[in-house]
Amino acid sequence: MINKAYKAVVLAAVLFALLPWDAAQADDPDFISGGIGYFDWNRQKSPAAEFRAEYRSDYTLWVFKPFGGIMATSEGAFYAYAGLGIDVFLGNRFVITPSIAPGFYAEGGGLDLGYPLEFRSQLEIAYRFDDRSRLGVAISHMSNASIVDENPGTESAILYYSVPLSTLLGR
């Protein structure tokens, strides 16, 4: 089932990449993003508050943008990750961003996901303000993609606020 989910995410990313691109993306900056949400909301085996901090680059590799971040839960779990996302602009205001990121997961006192190497797939929908900052909601799935026998996986629901790095640096 997980392999089918990853194939669906990859297919969706390719289809998004083939969509016509809006000129709004040309001046899109790099971002510092903060997120707060609900970890393991689907299975409720170890539900917790989730906190994220990310750097989202303005550099593009074809249509992919690199990003990296850290996540921590109120139960002591920690995840450090880096990956690629695609910003799909729907006009000047709305952005859909599918992404995938491998990373290192430590359960702490939280949910045991079966292996330190975990993969996070995510779909975010955001509103883009005049200053290019974004307010978005995202659904994430995290699992080890069945590289070991134990692969419980989990989902998160996240509220993001992304600020252009230039705004934070006063440029």
What residue spans do the PLM features occupy?
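Membrane-embedded beta-strands of outer-membrane beta-barrel proteins
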Residues: F51-Y55, A82-L84, L123, L159
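Residue-level signature of outer-membrane beta-barrel architecture
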Residues: Y55-Y59, I86-V88, Y127, H141, ...
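Outer-membrane beta-barrel "beta-signal"
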Residues: A49, P152-R171
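Solvent-exposed loop/turn segments connecting transmembrane beta-strands
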Residues: F39-A49, M71-Y81, G108-P116, S146-T154
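Mid-chain, well-packed structural core segment of small domains
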Residues: I96-E124
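Cleavable N-terminal export/targeting peptides
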Residues: M1-D28, L168-R171
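Transmembrane beta-strand segments that form the barrel wall of outer-membrane beta-barrel proteins
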Residues: F31-D40, V63-S74, I96-A106, V137-S143
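Repeated loop/turn-to-beta-strand initiation elements of outer-membrane beta-barrel proteins
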Residues: D30-I32, T60-K65, N92-I96, D131-V137, ...
